[in-house]
Regions:
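Formylglycine-dependent sulfatase
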Residues: 2-5, 10, 16, 20-442, ...
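Mature extracytoplasmic/periplasmic domains
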Residues: 471, 479-491
Length: 517
C-alpha cells in the first residue's frame, strides 16, 4: 500500500491529461475563423480616410487598414448590384453565371453561394440589410433561397437620419445574430448596407453631416463643377459614413465578446458611386472599389498596403479556404477566383504575386428602358494601370435611351447637371462621355486619367490587351466570344413590371417600376 500515493498521483495526472485533451478538441473545431463580410451599396474607390480622402470620414475602415491590409487594386467584374453580388457569392465571373450576369435577374438554381456551402459544413450563417439582388432566387423546387444567410432584421431606429438613409439598425441585428449563434460553432455574417444607394436627401451632407462645399478637393473630370454636384457628392459622403458607423459598432461588439481575434473582416462595396460615368458603366470609377481586410489571427504583418490586382471572384474561394473546405466538396459550381490567403501569409507590401497583374470586367443588361429589353455588352481588362474596353453594340447608348430617361444611370442632381451640358458647346464632351454613343474600342491610362475622359485607342496600340482579354474570355466559355451573346437579351427580367418597359412607355402606359432595394 505504500505505492498507493504514487498510483493516486498517476491517476490524477491521467485525469488532468484527459481533461486537457477533451478541452482541446472543441478548440480545434472552434479554430475555424468567423467571417464578417461588410458590403456597401454604391461606394467608389478612394473615398475613405485610409486612401487619403479628406471629405469622407471612415474610422472603422481606417482601423481595418491599420490592423489588416489595405488593397489598392480591387475590382468587381460588373459594376451593378445583382451581377456584382453574384460574382461575390459564387466565385465566378458574370459571363459564367448565365442569367445572373444580368441585373434584375432570375438567379439560376444551379449556382450555390459560399454562404449556403458554409451552412452545410458547420457554419452558422446570417445577414442583415441587402443580400444578393435585386432579383429572384429560388431553388429547383421553387422555394426562396437564403443566398446570404438567414435574415436578421428585427431592429430598426424609430426615425430616419435623412430621407435616404435606412432605419435598419444593422449593428443591432448583428448583435442578435451573435446571440443566436451556437457556442463553439463558427459563423459567417453578411452585412449589406443599403447606403450610399440613392435617393439622397439633398443638402443633408452640409445640414446634418457637418460638411462644407469647400471640403471637396476635386470634382471628377466627367461632371461639371457646380454647387449642386458638390452637394450631391457630400450627401453621398454622409451615407458612406453611416455605413462605416455600423461597421465600427460591429467591430466594437466583436472586441467586447472576445471574438475579434479570430474573425476575418472584409469591407468593400458592390460597385461604384451612383453617378454618371460610374455605377453601371465599366470605367475606373465604376468597377474599382475600396477593400480592406482584417484578421488578427490570420494576417501577417498588419498595416500593409497591397497593390496586387484582386477580383470579387476571389472572395468565395478565400472564405472556403480559411474554413478548411475543399471546393470539390461544397457542391458549388467550379470557382474561377483565387484565394487571397497567399497575400495574408506574406509579409510584403506593394506587388506580391506576379500573376495578379490584371482583372477582367464586363457589362450586359442592367436597368430597363432600351427597345426590346436590350443591354449594353462590354468586355474589358485592367492591366498595369491601363484599361481597355470593347463595346459590342456601338449603335446603342451606354446609359439607355432619351425616350425613357437614360435609366441605366440613377436620377440625381449630378445626372441633371451632366444632361444639361448637351446644349453647352464648351461642356458637351461631358454629356457625350456618359450618354453619347461610344466607339468599339476605348483605352485609358488610369495613372494619368483616372476619370477615363481621354480615349487613347486611336493613337496607342491595344492589340496585346485585346488579345489577352479575348483569349481568357474564350477559355472561360464566355457566350460573347462563342457567337451566343444574344442570350443575355433573351433572359427575362425577374419582375414582370421590368419587361418591355420601353415599348409599354412609348405606347402611353404609365409604369411604376419596382423600387430597387
Amino acid at each position: 500500500m505504500k505505492d498507493f500515493p504514487r498510483i493516486l498521483l498517476l491517476v490524477a495526472l491521467m485525469l488532468v491529461s484527459w481533461s486537457f485533451l477533451s478541452a482541446a478538441e472543441p478548440a480545434k473545431v472552434r479554430a475555424k475563423p468567423n467571417i464578417l463580410f461588410a458590403v456597401a451599396d454604391d461606394w467608389s474607390f478612394g473615398h475613405a480616410g485610409a486612401y487619403g480622402c479628406k471629405w469622407i470620414k471612415t474610422p472603422a475602415m481606417d482601423r481595418m487598414a491599420r490592423d489588416g491590409i489595405l488593397f489598392t487594386q480591387a475590382y468587381t467584374p460588373n459594376a451593378k448590384c445583382s451581377p456584382s453580388r453574384a460574382c461575390i457569392i459564387t466565385g465566378r465571373n458574370p459571363w459564367q453565371l448565365k442569367a445572373a450576369g444580368n441585373h434584375w435577374s432570375i438567379f439560376p438554381p444551379e449556382f450555390k453561394s459560399y454562404q449556403e456551402a458554409l451552412a452545410e459544413h458547420g457554419y452558422f450563417v446570417g445577414m442583415t440589410g441587402k443580400g444578393w439582388g435585386p432579383g429572384i432566387a429560388k431553388n429547383a423546387a421553387g422555394q426562396k433561397r437564403e443566398m446570404t444567410g438567414k435574415s436578421f432584421e428585427e431592429r430598426n431606429f424609430p426615425s430616419k437620419i435623412t430621407k435616404g438613409i435606412s432605419r435598419t439598425d444593422y449593428a443591432g441585428n448583428f448583435n442578435d445574430f451573435l446571440d443566436a449563434a451556437p457556442k463553439g460553432k463558427p459563423w459567417s455574417f453578411w452585412y449589406g448596407g443599403h447606403e450610399p444607394h440613392r435617393g439622397y436627401e439633398y443638402g443633408s451632407g452640409v445640414a446634418k453631416g457637418d460638411k462644407k462645399i469647400s471640403d471637396i478637393d476635386r470634382v471628377p473630370a466627367c461632371w461639371p463643377d457646380t454647387e449642386e454636384v458638390r452637394n450631391d457628392m457630400l450627401d453621398y459622403a454622409f451615407e458612406v459614413e453611416n455605413f462605416d458607423l455600423h461597421l465600427g459598432r460591429m467591430l466594437a461588439e466583436l472586441e467586447k465578446r472576445g471574438e475579434l481575434h479570430n474573425t476575418i473582416v472584409v469591407v468593400t462595396s458592390d460597385n461604384g458611386m451612383p453617378f454618371p460615368h460610374c455605377k453601371g458603366y465599366a470605367y475606373n470609377n465604376s468597377d474599382h472599389l475600396p477593400l480592406a481586410i482584417m484578421w488578427p489571427q490570420g494576417i501577417s504583418k498588419p498595416g500593409r498596403v497591397v497593390d496586387d490586382y484582386v477580383s470579387f471572384i476571389d472572395f468565395a474561394p478565400t472564405f472556403l479556404d480559411v474554413a478548411g473546405m475543399k471546393q470539390s466538396t461544397t457542391g458549388m459550381a467550379s470557382i474561377t477566383g483565387r484565394s487571397l490567403t497567399e497575400i495574408f501569409k506574406s509579409d510584403q507590401s506593394g506587388r506580391i504575386i506576379t500573376e495578379r497583374d490584371h482583372v477582367l470586367l464586363a457589362k450586359e443588361r442592367n436597368d430597363v428602358g432600351r427597345p426590346k429589353d436590350e443591354g449594353y455588352p462590354i468586355r474589358a481588362i485592367v492591366k498595369e494601370g491601363m484599361l481597355y474596353l470593347h463595346n459590342f453594340e456601338t449603335s446603342r447608348g451606354p446609359a439607355g435611351v432619351p425616350e425613357t430617361g437614360y435609366k441605366d444611370t440613377d436620377d440625381s442632381p449630378t445626372k441633371t447637371a451632366v444632361l444639361a451640358t448637351e446644349k453647352k458647346p464648351d461642356l458637351k464632351h461631358l454629356f457625350e462621355a456618359s450618354f453619347g454613343k461610344l466607339p468599339a474600342d476605348q483605352l485609358f491610362d488610369l495613372r494619368r486619367d483616372p476619370d477615363c475622359m481621354t480615349n487613347l485607342a486611336t493613337t496607342v496600340s491595344f492589340a496585346d490587351l485585346q488579345k489577352q482579354l479575348f483569349e481568357e474570355l474564350k477559355q472561360q466559355g464566355d457566350p460573347r466570344m462563342l457567337g451566343q451573346g444574344n442570350i443575355y437579351d433573351e433572359y427575362p427580367y425577374g419582375f414582370a413590371d421590368k419587361r418591355n418597359f420601353y415599348e409599354r412607355t412609348i405606347g402611353g402606359e404609365k409604369i411604376e417600376a419596382t423600387k430597387e432595394e
